[in-house]
Amino acid sequence: QFNRQLGRAAMVHACDMLENGFFDHRGSDGSNSQARVQNAGYRDCIVAENIAWGYPRSEQIVNGWMNSPGHRRNMLHPRIEEFGVGITQGPKGPYWVLVVGKQC
């Protein structure tokens, strides 16, 4: 199910990548996905993050992630219960961030 805190963490990272011109799981401040979800108030036992850039439609990004073993594993992990999504539009296409997790 959608979780607002995970969505906030995902959006923060999508905006950070766009505003600071990079594409990486590590934020411009050195943060990782676990730090970002905790800063958003999420008490995580499990957290994983998928990022993508340039895919114009959601169907394309989901297909891309499902065809990538690591991204697919994040999305289908049996203990994952919640997700959040952040999308921001850049001049060369959108930045996509999916954060999945389970609270303790």
Regions found by a protein language model. Give the residues of each.
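Disulfide-stabilized extracellular recognition modules
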Residues: D44, A52-C104
